[in-house]
Amino acid sequence: MATEAQPAKQAKLLLVEDDVLIRMLLADMLDEIGYTVAAEAASIDEALEATRKTDFDLAILDADLDGRSVSPVADALVARDIGFVFVTGYDDHGLFAYRDRPTLKKPFQIDALKRCCKSALSSH
């Protein structure tokens, strides 16, 4: 019985989300659409460390980490010229300086995640 070949991994991602269950779900979704999660972070400090120590092509950022804005992480990514996508449960992620960045409003479907990642990767 033949099995379907798995798609080649397209890119390595940094996943920044403070809710462990959402982070696990996002990691599974990213794997399903062919991306490799290079590192995960649950806090701003962990995310900043990952930006310094991990090789990745794109970041998925929860806009609010335990009540703190993720803007220091976004600033670090801009300095390294690495694209990112915001995910948020709010209507507005509150990061005016980054209003032009792709944003997914939770909950979202896997197809929306795939389109958003592809778009963010192609623009960087």
Which role fits each region the language model picked out?
Residues E17:
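Conserved acidic carboxylate
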Residues E40-L58:
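Acidic, metal-coordinating helix/loop segments flanking the phosphotransfer/catalytic sites
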Residues V20-A39:
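Two-component/phosphorelay signaling modules centered on CheY-like receiver
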Residues R68-I82:
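Short amphipathic alpha-helix used as the core "switch/output" element in two-component signaling
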Residues D62:
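Active-site residues of response regulator receiver
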Residues V87-T88:
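Hydrophobic/aromatic residues positioned on beta-strands within the core alpha/beta folds
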Residues M1-K12, Q109-H124:
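Non-catalytic signal-transmission and effector/linker regions of two-component phosphorelay proteins
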